[in-house]
Amino acid sequence: RQICIRDRAVTSMLALNPLIKNDLIDTDHIVVDSKIGSSGAGAGAGTSHAMRAGVIRPYKPAKHRHTGEIEQELSETAGRKIKVSMSPHAVDVVRGILCTNHTFLKKDVDEKELWKIYRSEYSEERFIRLIRDKDGLHKFPDPKFLVGSNFCDIGFDLDKDNNRLIALSASDNLMKGAAGSAIQNMNVMSGFDEFEGIMYSPLTPV
């Protein structure tokens, strides 16, 4: 089954799927905070530079239409109905999406075990990169470093005081979130090399 899922859905789902598959999180309390550039919206007054520059604008903070896509795919993984709350924000970039996925742990798990779970899930997936730098400016996924590529970067942080696991995921909404995933699916369905035509390095710095 090859499904081409939209930008916010695929970006958040890739971070959440291993956690649900391993029954690590409370599936009744998943909150997705997504931030996306202007290319994620249609043409209109709200996407002009004058209106978009400098903004961090919430829109459709409840019942966004892409919520159903996330719930559909995660429910299939879990084998039961899962509910997700998602609140998107428009930000002052053209391309890129960052999902901060707030989850709550059902069992005690440490950072080492979480990395093992993510590596086990994505070790064969060349378009998924696991990101964590203990020092430096870019400790977590950042869509700036994904523009023009079909990669999705995933990382996480643990809030032990509140039993919270924050799974972070970033992608280029026009590539992994749209055309890149479509071409990748077409390659698989047609028997081509999965990476044909989409194995590009990110366009950073621009």
How does the language model describe each region?
Residues 1-5:
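Short, small-residue-biased leader/transition segments that mark boundaries at the very start
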Residues 6-10, 38, 174-175:
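Gly/Ser/Thr-rich loops at beta-strand to alpha-helix junctions
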Residues 7-24, 32:
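Alpha-helical support elements that line or immediately flank enzyme active sites
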Residues 13-20, 67-71, 115, 119, ...:
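Predominant activation on well-ordered alpha-helical scaffold segments within soluble catalytic domains
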